[in-house]
UniProtKB/Swiss-Prot annotation:
One of its GO terms (biological process) is polysaccharide catabolic process. InterPro entries: 6-hairpin_glycosidase_sf (IPR008928), 6hp_glycosidase-like_sf (IPR012341), Carb-bd-like_fold (IPR013784), CBM20 (IPR002044), CBM20_glucoamylase (IPR034836), GH15-like (IPR011613), Glucoamylase (IPR000165), Glucoamylase_active_site (IPR046966). It catalyses: Hydrolysis of terminal (1->4)-linked alpha-D-glucose residues successively from non-reducing ends of the chains with release of beta-D-glucose. Disulfide bonds join 236-239, 248-475, 288-296. Residues 1-19 form the signal peptide. It comes from the Eukaryota. This is Glucoamylase. It is an enzyme of class 3 (hydrolase). Substrate binds at residue 146. Keywords: Carbohydrate metabolism, Disulfide bond, Glycoprotein, Glycosidase, Hydrolase, Polysaccharide degradation, Signal. One of its GO terms (molecular function) is starch binding.
Length: 612
């Protein structure tokens, strides 16, 4: 988000936010933690989507809020970029069998059709308005000062909707894709084709110029947009004319040793935006293509080392880490927003690129080391040398093992600094790793889900990278006019007959995300925790109790909440405790009792209490 200033953390009406900072944990049992954290992250995303999300009250249906945080910083808005990335994650989960997400995806597309038509400071539907970066959660224009326009949003939104549209066609619902999805997608593609070559603000909302990330995702959107248009019986000539020019321009960001993140801004150009560009244009059918900076390409791997190395010496929490060990990763080394810290999503992006590369090497059956990528490989495997190594060779196996361990190291850093409840804010501090900036950042949770899936070799559908090979002999920053039209989606036809659909046998989940909400008036420095008879609640040990958060606390509604993943059907007893300066006060007897739901399709629950 925009880093206008670094601010003091807010106090919630007498309750210190800092008082409920998580205790840092050692990174153990990564597989087990990821299984639990993935479930938590899925629910945390749903909590941040209107109108029914627990943390998105007041947001219109389908609107994805960036964070529930309303002060220091205020992220209670919907960003087109964040929403597109988050929804693409949910669409991928849906295509993988998570049928419960269908109505959320439909509501998202309906909401975006409405938002596209809102006149705003960047313009109207057909005059640049799609480049407006953020809106109020009630689908009204945000008219305050901001870094606008931002041109990555329409491309990312188009990619998310195209993926769902392709699923519709593949499952016999072509008319829905044609009548409801394509018109909304076409607006975004028209914007990308018209404005891709013009300057705008980067994804961090700070640098005005042209950005690698924006150009990369624009290229992808135009390529898959053209294919999707043909699938629904239409065409996208403006996609076809501009995609080769965008691909040509993309090459200009390569410096010879790393990817220049932005043209403009006066910084070194070493920026995780380049790694994000690589992972969000990853095509599981692609080779290690330098032209599109595929994750396993020599360029992308060389860039990964340069970018991640730029954070090794500037964060105290990275002290003592060897060259072959993962580090906490921020946005760019010159960052000063909230004093310039590592972010959860950027650290996870560093891991995800490596998991993508591992998938690509396995699919190709070999890996190649060039002069460009040699520094990356030598840092992890000291005897690395240029050449191509088949998957049957010892060198290949040793390198793959080293890269896998290196990738896991980034996720273990996230595991260490995530809250014991699973919560992830935007950032964790460079000095001690305590969480800071906006709480429960939706993008953080989406990044966890995508990194975890790639680690498990669960990959998205291809987007056509292998067919997008044309590069003009001379680049030209051209543009093309498309077709804009106002779209109103009043309702969605019933979609049935697919795995997990309402008419299919329903599955009882193995775990349920239970949110405990207790009203307890507190004073400055006092916190509320939950402790109980099961290990997830500390086995009645106050020192192992789970801290609740006071982010929704007001004088009229002194609410403390926390979400914990628990086994379905588990019965247990619990109590709330007050903790201040190490002193523990238990609430009065009797013990509270609760049984986790074990019901078809129920993956979350809320238990509301009042302190006694």
């Amino acid at each position: 988000m925009v880093s206008f200033s670094s601010c003091l953390r807010a106090l919630a009406l007498g309750s210190s936010v800092l008082a409920v900072q998580p205790v840092l944990r050692q990174a153990t049992g990564l597989d087990t933690w990821l299984s639990t954290e993935a479930n938590f992250s899925r629910q945390a995303i749903l909590n941040n989507i209107g109108a029914d999300g627990q943390s998105a009250q007041g947001a219109s249906p389908g609107v994805v809020i960036a964070s529930p945080s309303k002060s220091d910083p205020d992220y209670f808005y919907t960003w087109t970029r964040d929403s597109g990335l988050v929804m693409k994650t949910l669409v991928d989960l849906f295509r993988g069998g998570d049928a419960d997400l269908l109505p959320i995806i439909e509501e998202f597309i309906s909401s975006q059709a409405r938002i596209q038509g809102i006149s705003n400071p960047s313009g109207a539907l057909s005059s640049g308005g799609l480049g407006e970066p953020k809106f109020n959660v009630d689908e009204t224009a945000f008219t305050g000062a901001w870094g606008r326009p931002q041109r990555d949003g329409p491309a990312l939104r188009a990619t998310a909707m195209i993926s769902f549209g392709e699923w519709l066609v593949e499952n016999g619902h072509t008319s829905i894709a044609t009548d409801l999805v394509w018109p909304v997608v076409r607006n975004d593609l028209s914007y990308v084709a018209q404005y891709w070559s013009q300057s705008g603000f980067d994804l961090w909302e700070e640098v005005q110029g042209t950005s690698f990330f924006t150009v990369a995702v624009s290229h992808r959107a135009l390529v898959e947009g053209s294919s999707f248009a043909k699938t629904v019986g239409s065409s996208c000539p403006y996609c076809d004319s501009q995609a080769p020019q965008v691909r040509c321009y993309l090459q200009s960001f390569w410096t010879g040793s790393y990817i220049q993140a932005n043209f403009g801004g006066g910084r070194s150009g070493k920026d995780i935006n380049t790694v994000l560009g690589s992972i969000h244009t990853f095509d599981p059918q692609a080779t290690c293509d330098d032209a599109t900076f595929q994750p396993c390409s020599a360029r992308a791997l060389a860039n990964h080392k340069v970018v991640t190395d730029s954070f090794r010496s500037i964060y105290a929490i990275n002290s003592g880490r060897a060259e072959n060990q993962a580090v906490a990763v921020g946005r760019y080394p010159e960052d000063s927003y909230y004093n310039g810290n590592p972010w959860f999503l950027t650290t996870l992006a560093a891991a995800e690129q490596l998991y993508d590369a591992l998938y690509q090497w396995d699919k190709i059956g070999s890996l190649a080391i060039t002069d460009v990528s040699l520094p990356f490989f030598k840092a992890l495997y000291s005897s690395a040398a240029t050449g191509t190594y088949a998957s049957s060779t010892t060198v290949y196996k040793d390198i793959v093992s080293a890269v896998k361990a290196y990738a896991d190291g980034y996720v273990q850093i996230v595991q260490t600094y995530a809250a014991s409840t699973g919560s992830m804010a935007e950032q964790y501090t460079k000095t001690d790793g305590s969480q800071t900036s906006a709480r429960d950042l939706t993008w953080s949770y989406a990044a966890l889900l995508t990194a975890n899936n790639r680690r498990n070799a669960v990959v998205p559908a291809p987007w056509g990278e292998t067919a997008a090979t044309s590069i003009p002999s001379a680049c030209s920053t051209t543009s093309a006019s498309g077709t804009y039209s106002s779209v109103v989606i009043t309702s969605w036809p019933t979609i049935s007959g697919y795995p997990g659909a309402p008419d299919s046998p329903c599955q009882v989940p193995t775990t349920v995300s239970v949110t405990f909400a207790v009203k307890a008036t507190t004073v400055y420095g006092e916190s509320i925790k939950i402790v109980g008879s099961i290990s997830q609640l500390g086995s009645w040990n106050p020192s192992s109790a789970t801290a609740l958060n006071a982010d929704s606390y007001t004088t009229d509604n002194p609410l403390w909440t926390g979400t914990i993943n628990l086994p379905a059907g588990q019965s247990f007893e619990y109590k709330f405790i007050r903790v201040q300066n190490g002193a523990v006060t238990w609430e009065s007897d009797p013990n509270r009792k609760y049984t986790v739901p074990s019901t078809c399709g129920v993956k979350s629950a809320v238990q509301s209490d009042v302190w006694r």
